[in-house]
Swiss-Prot record:
Keywords: NADP, Oxidoreductase. SUPFAM superfamilies: NAD(P)-binding Rossmann-fold domains. The lineage of its organism: Eukaryota, Fungi, Dikarya, Ascomycota, Pezizomycotina. It is an enzyme of class 1 (oxidoreductase). This is Short chain dehydrogenase ausX.
Length: 259
């Protein structure tokens, strides 16, 4: 299947071991791409035997992870990077500005904002040499709203929108596109892994209940999104099928972004 015209393209995908990242990696490989997958978890068993898949284990909150990941990609596939999918992310505990801990703030900003920017910093010089490249960041409903998550997650995802738009404008004349896809709640993403639900800011959660319920009803009606649904959106914006689209903020949430 080559429906996305990425045959032999070299694509870096973060969060590749589960959820949206795994679905996107699987679809990219099926479309003929060569993928460097990055994750803090183990390499996904379903992809390990694929000769076009290289796995790089990394905690993206570490300062040198981005640089080392790009070096691993070059070692595997040469000095060519066609695409970057910044998918890896972590949730907060819905903590408000008056309750957020330093650790929670630092981790959300490090993984959800700093790591994507560092990876873009590393791949853009390679893309500039080729005169072409496509970057797709993964945001959230929280990229456009202050009423769905805590202050750390919200700030990190708002910041990623700004970084996306800046990259899109700055490199628009060099064939490099940058967009951000903003999912709503997606089943089996793994983004809540390691989150202690008993530590959620219950007062803040109560304020957001009506917003969350509006989206939860989609799943109850069988309209909820799966990781594979997001993978198709991501591959579309990564590929030349979306030529001319850059700096866009694209909600993929069954209209949740309208409220």
């Amino acid at each position: 299947m080559t429906m996305y015209n990425i045959q032999d393209h070299v694509v870096i995908i973060t969060g590749s071991s589960s959820g949206i990242g795994l679905a996107a990696s699987t679809l990219a490989l099926a479309s003929g791409a060569k993928v460097l997958g990055i994750d803090i978890s183990n390499s996904p068993a379903s992809l390990t035997a694929n000769p076009n898949y290289t796995f790089f284990a990394a905690d993206l909150s570490h300062p040198e992870s981005a640089k080392k990941a790009i070096a691993a990609c070059i070692a595997a596939y040469g000095n060519r990077i066609d695409g970057l999918l910044n998918i890896a992310g972590v949730m907060d505990l819905n903590q408000s500005a008056d309750t957020v801990t330093d650790d929670m703030w630092d981790r959300c900003i490090a993984i959800n904002l700093t790591a994507p920017v560092k990876l873009m910093r590393e791949v853009i010089p390679i893309m500039r040499l080729r005169g072409k490249g496509s970057i797709v960041n993964v945001g959230s409903k929280a990229s456009m709203s202050g009423a769905v998550s805590g202050v750390a997650y919200t700030a990190s995802k708002h910041g990623l929108v700004g970084a996306t738009k800046n990259v899109a404008w700055r490199f628009k004349h060099e064939g490099i596109r940058c967009n951000i896809v903003c999912p709503g709640g997606v089943a089996a993403t793994g983004i809540r892994d390691g989150v202690d639900s008993t530590q959620f800011d219950s007062e803040a959660m109560e304020m957001m209940t009506v917003i969350h319920q509006a989206h939860a009803s989609d799943h109850a009606k069988g309209l909820g999104l799966q990781p594979e649904d997001l993978a198709h959106s991501l591959l579309y914006f990564l590929s030349d099928l979306s030529k001319g689209i850059s700096g866009a903020v694209i909600p993929v949430d069954n209209a949740w972004s309208t409220i």
